[in-house]
């Protein structure tokens, strides 16, 4: 079983959020986008696998032009672990950040982000005409302006243009 943890896998570092991910350790693989809560540039993603052989079965190729670069022994040929043959050292940036910031501090920052979404929800509910579409969870709260005097169709017509220009606040 694969878990798409692109956004949510970072909750494993959070004291409060990790309870939402009970059972994730049973998965065969997890994808995780470190650029989504870990102060990384876009494109810093990780795939964690229980069995390396699954990556090898998925991506291994043996073109003639790579035969002279083949490794012997227990070291993997990294081109057999993913689709890119040449890749930037994205993992080094993540590793360095983890060494400097630490997993405990990242957990605190994620917990803080989740608390801020809950606080935003409380503030939004204080104003008439605003409704919560999806309650605060994992650092996100979805809301819209929906005055009672307008129908759902009118509220949608009012909010659609806003969603094109203001995706996040």
Regions flagged by a language model, labelled:
Residues 1-56:
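Conserved PLP-enzyme active-site core in the AAT-like
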Residues 3-7, 125, 130-131, 152:
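Non-catalytic, mobile gating and regulatory segments of ester bond hydrolases
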Residues 6-10, 62-65, 134-142:
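A glycine-rich phosphate-binding loop feature that marks nucleotide/adenosyl-phosphate handling sites
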Residues 37, 43-50, 73-132, 137-141:
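Structural motif of enzymes handling amino- and sulfur-group chemistry
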Residues 47-76:
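Conserved core segment of the aminotransferase class I/II
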Residues 131-162:
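Conserved PLP-binding catalytic core of the aspartate aminotransferase-like
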């Amino acid at each position: 079983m694969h878990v798409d943890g692109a956004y949510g896998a970072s909750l494993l570092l959070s004291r409060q959020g990790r309870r939402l991910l009970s059972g994730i350790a049973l998965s065969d693989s997890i994808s995780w986008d470190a650029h989504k809560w870990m102060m990384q540039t876009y494109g810093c993603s990780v795939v964690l696998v229980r069995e390396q052989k699954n990556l090898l079965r998925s991506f291994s190729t043996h073109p003639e032009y790579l035969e002279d670069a083949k490794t012997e022994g227990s070291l993997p040929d990294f081109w057999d672990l993913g689709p890119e043959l040449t890749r930037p050292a994205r993992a080094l940036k993540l590793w360095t950040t983890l060494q400097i910031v630490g997993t405990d501090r990242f957990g605190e920052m994620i917990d803080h982000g989740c608390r801020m979404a809950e606080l935003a929800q409380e503030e939004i509910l204080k104003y008439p005409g605003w409704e919560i579409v999806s309650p605060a969870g994992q650092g996100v709260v979805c809301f819209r302006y929906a005055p009672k005097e307008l129908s759902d169709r009118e509220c949608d017509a009012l909010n659609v243009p806003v969603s094109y220009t203001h995706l996040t606040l």
